[in-house]
UniProtKB/Swiss-Prot annotation:
<dbReference type="GO" id="GO:0005525">
    <property type="term" value="F:GTP binding"/>
</dbReference>
<dbReference type="GO" id="GO:0003924">
    <property type="term" value="F:GTPase activity"/>
</dbReference>
<dbReference type="Pfam" id="PF22042">
    <property type="entry name" value="EF-G_D2"/>
</dbReference>
<feature type="binding site">
    <location>
        <begin position="142"/>
        <end position="145"/>
    </location>
    <ligand>
        <name>GTP</name>
    </ligand>
</feature>
<comment type="function">
    <text>Increases the formation of ribosomal termination complexes and stimulates activities of RF-1 and RF-2. It binds guanine nucleotides and has strong preference for UGA stop codons. It may interact directly with the ribosome. The stimulation of RF-1 and RF-2 is significantly reduced by GTP and GDP, but not by GMP.</text>
</comment>
<dbReference type="InterPro" id="IPR053905">
    <property type="entry name" value="EF-G-like_DII"/>
</dbReference>
<feature type="domain" description="tr-type G">
    <location>
        <begin position="11"/>
        <end position="280"/>
    </location>
</feature>
<dbReference type="GO" id="GO:0097216">
    <property type="term" value="F:guanosine tetraphosphate binding"/>
</dbReference>
<dbReference type="InterPro" id="IPR027417">
    <property type="entry name" value="P-loop_NTPase"/>
</dbReference>
<dbReference type="InterPro" id="IPR041732">
    <property type="entry name" value="RF3_GTP-bd"/>
</dbReference>
<dbReference type="Pfam" id="PF16658">
    <property type="entry name" value="RF3_C"/>
</dbReference>
<keyword id="KW-0963">Cytoplasm</keyword>
<dbReference type="InterPro" id="IPR031157">
    <property type="entry name" value="G_TR_CS"/>
</dbReference>
<keyword id="KW-0342">GTP-binding</keyword>
<dbReference type="Pfam" id="PF00009">
    <property type="entry name" value="GTP_EFTU"/>
</dbReference>
<dbReference type="GO" id="GO:0016149">
    <property type="term" value="F:translation release factor activity, codon specific"/>
</dbReference>
<dbReference type="InterPro" id="IPR004548">
    <property type="entry name" value="PrfC"/>
</dbReference>
Length: 529
């Protein structure tokens, strides 16, 4: 590769994730995006009936049964002279930690809103996470083939609840059975909707000009007039698109459409490739790393077990921050101080894996992991630096895991530690007994753990209630005081999967008392990986 080629390769990368409330249509949008990127030939309807293919991006056994994307997969596809990396985030309300971490690996997000429902609680939470890094947001108002709320009201709600300015790019003409298409405010064009084009891409009829009589013929006089009246109002009351405000995360361009009807998806893809930022610089402990730097750096934001049921393997997902990966190159695994030769990294089309010959800043590659890589690990071409800002949250729910066969204790521990390194669950081993306590941010995670212990480690386990209300990581600068604290609180102390000391409190009152009694000890609710 010539040196001139490198900036060009980086500049055409766009790495984004989709955030939404469960059932707002995220998986359908993911499919349609892949259809436009020529990554899949036909878009199957997500909850396929036995014979139909399941949605391409949901591939684990339990996901197949439940029809939810439990794990984050990565898909790369070309679009408009760009190379787009889409990180699929878990759509189920339980899987927040994995989602939060995925959002640290993208440069922009698409927020999908069910236009019949408006802003929902999960979207609010996810937006808070994107705020931590001022991630630019594009918005897609979905499901216009159903009856929706007033579009102006939807924009007002996004602005007041999510505290972000809206700049409509397209505007809907009717909805539900009367949905006729959208008008593009900046191109002065109307795109007409036809039903029944869900799984393939078809030519869309375009009418130029808002006052073109063809428009009245196509959508009917009433809807055409309604559109003109609404646009007068919209132009007066809403924000114009401003690229700088968008990049700063203060303004979101809004598109309307229906993912199921495969309409409007290309409009936001055009917006994404034209406006969303190229791979961005990233804060490390010693300096800021620019994506234009020639030397390779990257961080691991997710670990996933058994992406290939035929291979009992685990894959660490690494976001390339700078430089170029080439097959067989030597990288430094900074945390353990070892050099490793990476000869078989993977690139992704969800569920299909290909060996990566090369990857650039902004890309995600998969590293085969035999238990040495953890979330938050940094890889470089020799420099000692660690990327920051990959969070671990104190769990909110706890269960004790118990074996049906007590002789399998070793396999159980191995399985739980691996699942905790992967970020699927957190595991705590109390100092005073041989219990194994798992902590999660949502109930469904416990089911996932039990089912994966069985399928992947051949361990039959059950979970039961345990007297733990919350957990905090503890540290203290004064070793003498820390020793005293540890001696007096042994019954409440445990080690997590990474052997970090944790205080497990039976009640919030107990935690508050401990914090009052030991002011020199710091109790952390989150910690960096």
């Amino acid at each position: 590769m010539s040196l001139n080629d490198y900036p060009q390769q980086v500049n055409k990368r766009r790495t984004f994730a989709i955030i939404s409330h469960p059932d707002a249509g995220k998986t359908t949008i993911t499919e349609k995006v892949l259809l436009y990127g020529n990554a899949i030939q036909t878009a199957g309807s997500v909850k396929g009936k036995g014979s139909q293919a399941h949605a391409k991006s949901d591939w684990m056994e339990m996901e197949k049964q439940r029809g939810i994307s439990i794990t984050t997969s990565v898909m790369q596809f070309p679009y408009n002279d760009c190379l787009v990396n889409l990180l699929d985030t878990p759509g189920h309300e339980d899987f927040s930690e994995d989602t939060y971490r995925t959002l640290t690996a993208v440069d922009s997000c698409l927020m999908v809103i069910d236009a019949a429902k408006g802003v929902e609680e999960r979207t609010i939470k996810l937006m808070e996470v994107t705020r931590l890094r001022d991630t630019p947001i594009l918005t897609f108002m979905n499901k216009l083939d159903r009856d929706i709320r007033d579009p102006m009201e939807l924009l007002d709600e996004v602005e007041s609840v999510l505290k972000i300015h809206c700049a409509p790019i397209t505007w809907p003409i009717g909805c539900g059975k009367l949905f006729k298409g959208v008008y593009h405010l900046y191109k002065d064009e109307t795109y007409l909707y036809q039903t029944g084009q869900g799984s393939t891409i078809q030519e869309v009829k375009i009418v130029k000009g808002l006052n073109n009589p063809e428009l009245d013929n196509a959508v009917g006089d009433d809807l055409a007039q309604q559109l003109r009246d609404e646009l007068e109002l919209v132009k007066g009351a809403s924000n114009e698109f401003d690229h700088e405000l968008f990049i700063g995360g203060e303004l979101t361009p809004v598109f309307f459409g229906t993912a199921l009807g495969n309409f409007g998806v290309d409009h936001f893809l055009d917006g994404l490739t034209e406006w969303a930022p190229k791979p961005q610089p990233r804060q490390a402990d010693t300096r800021i790393v620019e994506s234009s730097e020639e030397k390779l750096t990257g961080f691991v934001f997710k670990i996933q077990a058994n992406m290939d049921p035929k291979h009992r393997d685990r894959v660490a997902f690494m976001r390339v921050v700078s430089g170029k990966y080439e097959k067989g190159m030597k990288l430094k695994h900074v945390r353990i101080g070892k050099d490793v030769v990476i000869s078989d990294a993977l690139t992704f089309m969800a569920g299909d894996r290909a060996h990566a010959e090369e990857a650039y800043a902004g890309d995600i590659i998969g590293l085969h992991n035999h238990g040495t890589i953890q979330i938050g690990d940094t890889f470089t071409q020799g420099e000692d630096l660690k990327f920051t800002g990959i969070p671990n949250f104190a769990p909110e729910l706890f269960r004790r895991i118990r074996l049906k066969d007590p002789l399998k204790q070793k396999q159980l521990l191995k399985g739980l530690v691996q699942l905790s390194e992967e970020g699927a669950v957190q595991v705590f081993r109390p100092m005073m007994n041989n219990d194994l306590i798992v902590g999660a941010v949502g109930v469904l995670q416990f089911d996932v753990v039990v089912s994966r212990l069985k399928t992947e480690y051949n361990v039959e386990a059950i979970y039961e209630n345990v007297n733990v209300a919350t957990a905090r990581w503890v540290e203290c600068a004064d070793s003498k005081k820390f020793e005293e604290f540890k001696r007096k609180n042994e019954q409440n102390l445990a080690l997590d999967g990474g052997d970090n000391l944790t205080y497990i409190a039976p009640t919030m009152v107990n935690l508050n008392l401990a914090q009052e009694r030991y002011p020199d000890v710091t109790f952390f609710k989150t910690r960096e990986h």
